[in-house]
Amino acid sequence: MLERLNFIENKYEELSNKISDPSVMANQKEWQKLCKEHADLEIIVNTYREYKKAQEDLESDKEMLKEESDKELREMAQEEIKELTLKLEDLERELTILLLPKDPNDDKDVFIEIRAGAGGEEAALFASNLLRMYTRYAERKNWKVETMSLNATDIGGFKEVTVAIKGKGAYSRLKYESGVHRVQRVPDTESSGRIHTSTATVAVLPEVDDVDININANDLRIDVYRASGHGGQCVNTTDSAVRITHLPTGLVVTCQDEKSQLKNKEKAMKVLKARLFEAAEAERAASIAEDRKSQVGTGDRSERIRTYNYPQGRITDHRIGLTLYKLETFLDGDIDEVIEALVTEDQAEKMKDLGRVN
């Protein structure tokens, strides 16, 4: 590990020199790429330097303990040695985590697709609850939320809705939300007070650049039609809504949120690229580790990941067996406690994998 950390520190110094070079700064695209690489290494280098300083201090205290005869000074040195030993253990764990393979999509913006599952109108209302939860979470993070497409019901639910969430680290936090979310509650329309179970499916897709995926224009069928609102009524007198079908895969994306046909097409293409990228990534991951299923979950949208129980005020994440009794604040976007637990479990799984490889 130390050999790798020394290499990273040297690389960081090289990048520091490059990004301050006027000739490199003249090429803005290359300069921004180097700045990002420099920023990605900074936390590792700073932690490593703190680790080396603690090691030096520890050796110094050990030397002093050998030579010092004063009782009080020896006691101080022994106490410092204990503290520094614990600090080094913590820093070593932190460095191990920092050196884990990073998901290349972690820094990307995301699309979140929410679809009502089993449960009819109640499932559609739950889909709207989930949309609000992610919107409130994004607000807490100062991320931007943009509606891409929606299919609303007459009573305020969503058969399906897609939003873009833009902000630093959006995918790294939200990627754990892919899967089936289950709600248990008494619907407003239920006169007998029986608890119903409904579901909604969430898919979290990283937004991809043109360089990440290439789409042949001949593989697309693009249809335009008039946008409709709640209950199907027409809300636009022009054919501004867009439906794009990717013929080789059968994937269909619609967008009618904008008044401009061109803007709707641009939005739909972004979502289509994200879906195709996700499909390619899933196929690649399956070929690399066909039988491996992380305890954190596969990210498969068919996997049941969480239950929201209203009568008990309970949320249970089934992937890690975590139960919290804070349903109201959770649905108001206070979801970091669960996400942190999922991140920790994911890191533990990756460390196990590294141990098996090594």
Curated annotation (Swiss-Prot):
Major subcellular location class: cytoplasm
GO MF annotation list: translation release factor activity, codon specific
One Pfam family named in its UniProt record: PCRF
Modified residue annotations for N5-methylglutamine: Q233
InterPro entries listed in its UniProt record: PCRF, Pep_chain_release_fac_I, Pep_chain_release_fac_I_sf, Prokaryotic/Mito_RF, RF-1
PTM note: Methylated by PrmC. Methylation increases the termination efficiency of RF1.
Gene Ontology cellular-component terms listed: cytoplasm
Location in or out of the cell: Cytoplasm
Protein keywords: Cytoplasm, Methylation, Protein biosynthesis
Family the entry assigns: Belongs to the prokaryotic/mitochondrial release factor family.
Job description of the protein: Peptide chain release factor 1 directs the termination of translation in response to the peptide chain termination codons UAG and UAA.
Protein name: Peptide chain release factor 1
Organism: Clostridium botulinum (strain Langeland / NCTC 10281 / Type F)
